[in-house]
Amino acid sequence: MDFLTLEQSVWSRLKEETRPIVLYGMGDGADKILAQFDRLGIRASGVFASDEFARGNLFHGFSVRKLSDTTAELGEDIVIVISFASQRPEVLAKMYELDAGYDVVAPDVPVVPGPLFDEAFVREHSADMQRAYELLADERSREVFLDTVRFKLSGRLKYLRNSESGKDEVFENILRPGADEHFSDLGAYNGDTIRELLHYTDGRFASVTALEPDRRSFRKLNEWASANIEGDVTLVQAGAWDRDEIRCFSDQAGRQSHVANKGRETQMRALDSVLNGRPCTYLKMD
């Protein structure tokens, strides 16, 4: 299969765009997208946020405004680049509402340093992608695979919507975790994902191993785990890495915490080192 025929790369399209390009959202995702804009010579014309978060603060030199203020200046014929991720229903509804009224894309950027999923990436990995596609056993899985490729290339939300599955369907019919799971949570926050897993296993598990580097989040995780779960539970105040070492960590509290060039020196751990030969059957990373 020629995967390059599925869709045009969002980056190529944005390079050719003559209409104003505005970012919806701030934070790590927007940082990464604007870095690619700089590298590729794509010009952003503004940044807006949901009305309740638009306070006129500066982000990369742009005043963060409401959409209504943005369109009052630039007009309605704009390209909106969604620059953050969410699974909250009300936020997704807002994204879909924007998609219905504007030209909207959500570029896929790597969470950690690495290549973009663009034409060059597809050309380099097309043989691997073909082998993965052929391993899939049913038509629905193959279509989800193709829609994922289409989305990662184009940034079009419709491809994600085509492949959505409700949380109950995912846990009860696809992942189907059971009482014998050895669960490793890399970036455990306050234990929210562990709680979710235990909801679907009726509180049963073989072991839980959780890493969380942020000191405030780890305290909440420890308090919750001590009060609510018993058994083979290992909580480690450390970030997940490919080796055991000390890294600077910007602990801005909660989900915005990240490895940085400056910040608090923080222990990082490789999961293999933490497990020390113990099994892992269910792995969550973020």
Task: For every predicted segment, state its role.
Residues 1-24, 28-44, 50-285:
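Phosphate/nucleotide-binding beta-alpha loop and adjacent structural elements of enzyme active sites
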